[in-house]
């Protein structure tokens, strides 16, 4: 295990069977080790795993735990190509400001809590910009923490492309808590 305690193991087959690839640091391309990935065991830390090499394609955030099949991490298929450890901010403080328009304009809402439905809580179907003031957060394309995921560290995001999205569709979000 790494100095930070972060460790993830990828398995070719379901239920932690078949060839295995262990990782304790960021890896831009592990396809040469595994042709497919059907199960994952996160033994330390929180990880972002990506569908393609170079941290691209669909991203999935995986906290410590066992994922015996790719549907458990809401994967679309058995293809993964890269991973990186998520570095959480220290102090356990969380605060985010979301805006209904780009460049921090329009109505602003501030929260320190998870939000399973932006429509129910803020009457928003889209978030066009945000400021992460404290903590690390995940935006989800759909309500109840489903759909494409976007990892947001402490900084300002003037438009959806700044957090890696093609559109402003964000309908739920939550803190990454270890």
UniProtKB/Swiss-Prot annotation:
A Pfam match: Crystall
Keyword Acetylation: yes
Domain Beta/gamma crystallin 'Greek key' intervals: 6-44, 45-87, 94-134, 135-177
Record's keyword annotation contains Repeat: yes
Gene3D superfamilies named among the record's database cross-references: Crystallins (2.60.20.10)
GO biological process: lens development in camera-type eye; morphogenesis of an epithelium; visual perception
Domain remark from Swiss-Prot or TrEMBL: Has a two-domain beta-structure, folded into four very similar Greek key motifs.
Protein name: Gamma-crystallin S
């Amino acid at each position: 295990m790494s100095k930070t305690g972060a460790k993830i193991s990828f398995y070719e087959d379901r239920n932690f069977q078949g060839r295995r690839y262990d990782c304790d640091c960021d890896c831009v391309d592990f396809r040469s080790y595994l042709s497919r990935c059907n199960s994952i065991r996160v033994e330390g830390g929180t990880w972002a795993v990506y569908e393609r090499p170079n941290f691209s394609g669909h991203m999935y955030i995986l906290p410590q735990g066992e994922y015996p099949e790719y549907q458990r991490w809401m994967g679309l298929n058995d293809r993964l190509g890269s991973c990186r450890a998520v570095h959480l901010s220290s102090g356990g403080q969380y605060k985010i400001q979301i805006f209904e328009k780009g460049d921090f304009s329009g109505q602003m809402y501030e929260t320190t809590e998870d939000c399973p439905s932006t429509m129910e809580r803020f009457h928003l179907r889209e978030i066009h910009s945000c400021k992460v003031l404290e903590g690390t957060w995940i935006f989800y394309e759909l309500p109840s923490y489903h759909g494409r995921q976007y990892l947001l560290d402490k900084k300002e995001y003037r438009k959806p492309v700044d957090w890696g999205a093609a559109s402003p569709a964000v309908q739920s979000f939550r803190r990454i808590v270890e």
